[in-house]
Amino acid sequence: MGRALIVVDVQNDFCEGGSLAVAGGAAVASAISAHVRGGGYDHVVATRDYHVDPGGHFSESPDYVDSWPVHCVAGTAGASFHPELDVTGVEAVFSKGAYEAAYSGFEGAAGDGASLVDWLRERGVERVDVVGIATDHCVRATALDAAAAGFATRVLLGLTAGVARPTVDSALEQLRAAGVELDGEPAVG
C-alpha cells in the first residue's frame, strides 16, 4: 500500500511578508522539510497556486471568501515555494488556478498535464498525508478531495497553518465528517 505526502501551497505569498500571509507559514515550511527528511513516504508531491488571470478571484476590495488580494502570480517571487521548504525530494508539482479560482490540489495539473489523482493512482498510492497552507482553505479542500477520490487521508495538523480560528474549526468539522484522520493541532493566525 503506497503512501504519499501532499505539500499544499507553501509559497512566499502565503508566508510572513507575502501578499496573503498566514501567521506561522515560514515555521510550517521548515517543519515540513524536517518531516520529509525523516522519510517514510513512497512519494512526495507539492501543489501551488499559480495564477495567470484568475478573473474575479483577485480584487482590490476582496471579501476573503470568493475574492482575494493579488497573490501567487505565475512567474513572480510570491508564487515561488518558501525558501525554508526543501523541495529536492518533491517528485511532481501540481499547479492550480491559472485562469480561475482553485483551492484543491486535485484541481491542478503537473507540467506534463497529469492530474494529481491520476499521478497518485499510477504509482499505487492508497494513503496520503496532507500538510501545508492554509488549513482552512487549500489544505481542507485538498484533503476532502483526496478522501472523495478513495485515498485513506490524514491531515498532519502540526504541519499546517490556518487563517482564523472560526474557519479552522469549521474546516476540521468538515474533514472529520468526511472521514479524514486528523493528527495534532494547527498553527492559527
Q: Predicted regions: what is each one?
A:
Residues 120-124:
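Immediate post-signal peptide segment of exported/extracytoplasmic ligand-binding proteins
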Residues 87-119:
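Histidine/lysine/aspartate-rich catalytic loop segments that bind and position anionic ligands
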Residues 53-56, 102-103, 139:
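Short catalytic/ligand-binding loop motif for oxyanion handling, primarily in non-cytosolic enzymes
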Residues 125-138, 155-160:
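Glycine-rich anion-binding loop/nest that anchors nucleotide
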Residues 29, 113-117, 140:
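Short, well-ordered alpha-helical scaffold segments within catalytic/effector domains
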Residues 71, 106, 132, 161-162:
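A generic secondary-structure micro-motif detector
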Residues 35, 137-148:
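Histidine-anchored nucleotide/phosphate-binding helix
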Residues 1-97, 126, 148, 152-155, ...:
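Active-site acidic carboxylates
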